[in-house]
Amino acid sequence: MKNINPTQTSAWQALQKHFDEMKDVTISELFAKDSDRFSKFSATFDDLMLVDFSKNRITEETLAKLQDLAKETDLAGAIKSMFSGEKINRTEDRAVLHVALRNRSNTPIVVDGKDVMPEVNAVLEKMKTFSEAIISGSWKGYTGKPITDVVNIGIGGSDLGPFMVTEALRPYKNHLNMHFVSNVDGTHIAEVLKNVNPETTLFLVASKTFTTQETMTNAHSARDWFLATAGDDKHVAKHFAALSTNAKAVGEFGIDTANMFEFWDWVGGRYSLWSAIGLSIILSVGFDNFVELLSGAHAMDKHFSTTPAEKNLPVLLALIGIWYNNFFGAETEAILPYDQYMHRFAAYFQQGNMESNGKYVDRNGHAVDYQTGPIIWGEPGTNGQHAFYQLIHQGTKMVPCDFIAPAITHNPLSDHHPKLLSNFFAQTEALAFGKSREVVEQEYRDQGKDPATLEHVVPFKVFEGNRPTNSILLREITPFSLGALIALYEHKIFTQGAILNIFTFDQWGVELGKQLANRILPELKDGSEVSSHDSSTNGLINRYKAWRA
């Protein structure tokens, strides 16, 4: 990958000039000028996904200049580097190959002179065999009973991805009850353990190194809870499996290394649901549906790696995001799925985006003087409409939004889905076009009221509009379409990182807090007053100790 400061390109300078021309142009004006705008600014993927980006403050000229930026920063070369196994995560000297995990074409992908696909396929086959034994009931616990509950113990990418997907695919769920524990707060695991039986529970300990503090603390508590009933350490092997590469530590914990599922250093945590970390997904929806998930992602991988920028969906969404973040000064994006099963999707890509592109140093090691990753947040519709949409509609901040919905619901109960989708369509229309003062006054007249007597209320009912949105309409949320949707967002994030000249696949920002926590932990174990920190931290620790005593 080339290290190119995007602000030093001629495309960036052209975009700055273009922004000066566009900043006061409204979405309403853009639609009024072009009756064919929707067809020009939307695209369909595999007849399964319609992406409508017409309600944005962009023109064909805007997209052309953004695509020039992608060319000048060598996005095409960056894509080729990732897919070919080049070590583009330079700060950790690692390749970035989550795409290999879903490489259903099985074409060779080489890292350090070795094709990784045989090992990828071997782990997949091992996951299939293990999961089929658990799901069928042929795998028995220490008292001879089949497994009924699975508890995934992980954190970050070892938790957010599997939890999001198992929730999104609940319509495909089998009889196994799934539970996820991540927080080192003992309350999290305590509440889960209240609802499971040690005789019929399988724990998945998801930690590449088998040393992650939060995960191993929870794993040891789960083991202690289990042994309080089971008694004999040998029974651990029937109730614990590991998603790890540290065979020695796994064995010492009591897990049979035959039930250790490996993944590789070229699998980043927040891109790991496609790997052994996805075992909980397989146990929830079955191996065939997991393969469909992989296949959907692979289809999007092919689209991303082979489609020209002007028709490439992840690239288009990424470029539009850069346009808002760096030229309009919009520092945030909302992800708003109109599907209750997708209630963890925004949280998943909050990590996916903010941990990937929340960087202030470029690939040359220099502080940037432009915006990098946006703040990502969101909740399912229509709940969000009754919470924070007020600010999106009438606040002083521009919040570009992605609205996501399925045309076909898994629960066609009465007229629930038409009502849900009517809100989905209405919100993007309202955000784009708003409601003028004239319309508000006419509404009063239609109600037989004199607008003059209500003049003091009118300004509060005016919606300026001109608030940008993307709409992603899926035919139906299936394992395949969900896989494609996740990969769409993954590649959007990669594209933005490549263009903005940052390293997307490391996460050094999580380290300092962990180091300081390890230093502070011993100080919390006795009653002595602490004075080794700043006055604020000392004061907080000492008050904690006083109240705990």
From Swiss-Prot:
It comes from the Bacteria. The keyword Protease does not apply. It catalyses: alpha-D-glucose 6-phosphate = beta-D-fructose 6-phosphate. Keywords: Cytoplasm, Gluconeogenesis, Glycolysis, Isomerase. One of its GO terms (cellular component) is cytosol. Disulfide bonds: none annotated. Pathway: Carbohydrate biosynthesis; gluconeogenesis; Carbohydrate degradation; glycolysis; D-glyceraldehyde 3-phosphate and glycerone phosphate from D-glucose: step 2/4. The active site is at E355, H386, K514. It is found in: Cytoplasm. The keyword DNA-binding does not apply. Its EC number is 5.3.1.9. One of its GO terms (biological process) is glycolytic process. GO terms for molecular function: carbohydrate derivative binding; glucose-6-phosphate isomerase activity; monosaccharide binding. Catalyzes the reversible isomerization of glucose-6-phosphate to fructose-6-phosphate. Belongs to the GPI family. This is Glucose-6-phosphate isomerase. The lineage of its organism: Bacteria, Pseudomonadati, Pseudomonadota, Gammaproteobacteria, Enterobacterales.
